[in-house]
């Protein structure tokens, strides 16, 4: 990355302030509101609903604004850390580096971050970014011919830029390395026993950015150097990596209710 610059900062939350917010919300909606607990603890509770997952367990919560890590030991103790910079920062770096149109920069950069690329070489085939070729029975839209496009669930989406496929791919991957990979390693090192990632056996990825098609693979290759296994969580065996904290909040509430 040569031109992109971004700044992210974490804001410390005060328990008393959160209590006041809960009280104000309770007065506004007329429903009892209580603090559910620390986000990292809730994320681990939710992640434990993934089939085959058990403690000791480390969780990487890759969201939009922060990269969070938590480690639960066999005796139930939880260590956590929150670092600024995650999905939104990656999108910002992609937008700035590629100088994408300002009228649709956020959505386009977000799509580039999430989807693989291809080059439309004819009306019946495209060359994917991994150099494989996909053929089509029906002709593609002539407006796509010669364009770099995103391979999405709804079809091919052309990118309004003069940059080559190789350039876009490199910018996307470098932004993810600078933000996700670097922050993930920093976070895991701070929660790992003795500050050594080698002491973590298994890591589960949760959060919206866990849906990304290549982040888990990038992390897998890097953590293999430490002998650490990493995989994407499947919350409640059906939700994938999302809703870990929400699931943990519900489970935590049920546990507190049962103890009353």
Q: Where are each of the predicted segments found?
A:
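Nucleotide/phosphate-binding catalytic cleft detector across ATP-hydrolyzing
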Residues: 1-56, 104, 119-122, 128-178, ...
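Short, contiguous, pocket-lining structural segments
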Residues: 9-17, 61-63, 82-86
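Contiguous, well-ordered alpha-helical segments that form the cores/surfaces of helical PPI scaffolds
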Residues: 42-46, 68, 92, 96
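Gly/Thr-rich phosphate-binding beta-strand-loop-beta motif of the actin/hexokinase/Hsp70
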Residues: 51-78
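A short acidic Gly-Thr/Ser loop motif
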Residues: 59-67, 84-87, 207-210
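Short acidic (Asp/Glu) and glycine-rich catalytic loops that position anionic groups and cofactors
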Residues: 70-75, 86-91, 160-165, 227-229
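Glycine-rich phosphate-binding loop plus the immediately following alpha-helix
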Residues: 76-121
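Catalytic-loop motifs flanking and including active-site residues across diverse enzymes
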Residues: 86, 90, 180, 245
């Amino acid at each position: 990355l040569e031109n992109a610059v971004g700044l992210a900062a974490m804001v410390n939350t005060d328990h008393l302030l959160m209590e006041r917010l809960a009280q104000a919300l309770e007065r506004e909606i007329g429903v009892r509101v209580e603090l559910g607990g620390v986000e990292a603890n809730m994320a681990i509770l939710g992640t434990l609903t993934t089939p085959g997952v058990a403690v000791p367990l480390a969780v990487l919560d890759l969201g939009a604004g922060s990269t969070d890590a938590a480690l639960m030991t066999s005796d139930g103790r939880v260590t956590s850390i929150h670092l600024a910079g995650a999905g939104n920062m990656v999108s910002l770096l992609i937008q700035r580096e590629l100088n994408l149109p300002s009228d649709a920069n956020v959505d386009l950069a977000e799509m580039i971050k999430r989807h693989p690329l291809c080059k439309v070489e004819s009306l019946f085939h495209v060359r994917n970014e991994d150099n494989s070729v996909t053929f089509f029975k029906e002709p593609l839209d002539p407006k796509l011919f010669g364009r770099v496009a995103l391979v999405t669930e709804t079809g091919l989406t052309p990118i309004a830029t003069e940059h080559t496929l190789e350039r876009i791919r490199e910018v996307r991957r470098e932004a993810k390395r600078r933000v996700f990979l670097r922050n993930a390693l920093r976070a895991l090192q701070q929660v790992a026993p003795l500050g050594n990632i080698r002491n973590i056996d298994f890591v589960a990825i949760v959060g919206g950015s866990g849906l990304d098609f290549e982040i888990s693979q990038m992390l897998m290759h890097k953590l293999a150097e430490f002998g650490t296994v990493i995989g994407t969580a499947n919350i409640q065996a059906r939700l994938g990596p999302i809703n870990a904290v929400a699931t943990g909040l519900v489970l935590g509430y049920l546990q507190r209710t049962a103890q009353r």
